[in-house]
């Protein structure tokens, strides 16, 4: 994968991100051959070993994020991974009454959203409320409108508390205190989580850190290159 193609995606799609963040994305050297290294996968599910031509080969299988049934700010019931099959997803967590970290988290998610408007068929941004008791459909819609969300591309959603909390802990593999989603349980993660079209986790980012938000943007661009290259091969 050549840098020239990657730069056209980054600088075409992310220019609007650089000004709000106070800097532009610096594409570091990825090797003397001009190729890039794609974001690694997280969550090893299993490792199989085989002997091929007398040599030991390891085949690593990575965790696949299971689907989640939610209701959105538009009142739609969505199975997220089925609805957005083949798309890159960026997840974060919030609740509408939060006055501490949620506003800056949501503003940074908005910046990412705006940065990739030209790639809106390939990416969806998913903000999951950790307070389903309070965050009803009308409340989610008002909150989405407050941040001028494109409702087709940026989904504000929730589900049962146990479903959301289990998804954060056991599917997105966030490092959170143990709990069972009951009334006393509460999580407030500040990470953005990048999931590729195969539902493998490809990155964790501090959504309050501008450098990490840039890194998330860079990794999204890498996955777009990966997606486009696969598509081009199929067309040949």
Mark where each language-model region is.
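Short active-site neighborhood of thiol/selenol oxidoreductases, capturing the structured segment around
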Residues: 78-109, 125-128
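N-terminal targeting signals for export/organelle localization
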Residues: 1-65, 236
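Structural microenvironment flanking redox-active thiols in thiol-disulfide oxidoreductases
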Residues: 106-167
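Short, small/polar residue-rich loop motifs at catalytic or cofactor-binding pockets
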Residues: 63-65, 87-88, 187-189
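Thiol-/selenol-based redox modules, centered on thioredoxin-like
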Residues: 180-236
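Structural micro-motif
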Residues: 152-154, 165, 169-177, 186-193
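Coil residues (strongly favoring Ser/Thr
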Residues: 49, 60, 76-77, 121, ...
């Amino acid at each position: 994968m050549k840098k020239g193609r990657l730069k056209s995606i980054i600088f075409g799609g992310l220019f609007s991100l650089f000004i709000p963040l106070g800097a532009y994305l610096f594409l570091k050297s990825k090797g003397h051959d001009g190729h890039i290294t794609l974001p690694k996968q997280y969550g090893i599910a299993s490792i199989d070993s085989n002997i091929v031509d007398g040599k030991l080969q390891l085949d690593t299988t990575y965790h696949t994020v299971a689907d989640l049934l939610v209701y959105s700010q538009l009142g739609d019931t969505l199975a997220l991974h089925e609805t957005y099959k083949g798309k890159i997803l960026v997840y974060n967590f919030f609740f509408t009454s939060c006055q501490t970290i949620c506003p800056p988290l949501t503003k940074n998610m908005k910046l990412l959203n705006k940065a990739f408007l030209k790639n809106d068929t390939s990416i969806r941004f998913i903000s999951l409320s950790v307070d389903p008791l309070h965050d009803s459909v009308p409340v989610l819609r008002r909150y989405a409108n407050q941040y001028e969300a494109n409702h087709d591309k940026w989904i504000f959603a929730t589900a049962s508390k146990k479903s959301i909390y289990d998804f954060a802990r056991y599917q997105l593999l966030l490092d959170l205190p143990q709990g069972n989603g009951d009334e006393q349980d509460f999580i407030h993660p500040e990470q953005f989580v990048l999931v590729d079209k195969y539902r493998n986790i490809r990155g964790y980012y501090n959504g309050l850190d501008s450098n990490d938000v840039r890194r998330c943007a860079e990794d999204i661009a890498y996955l777009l290159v990966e997606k486009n290259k696969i598509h081009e091969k199929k067309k040949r």
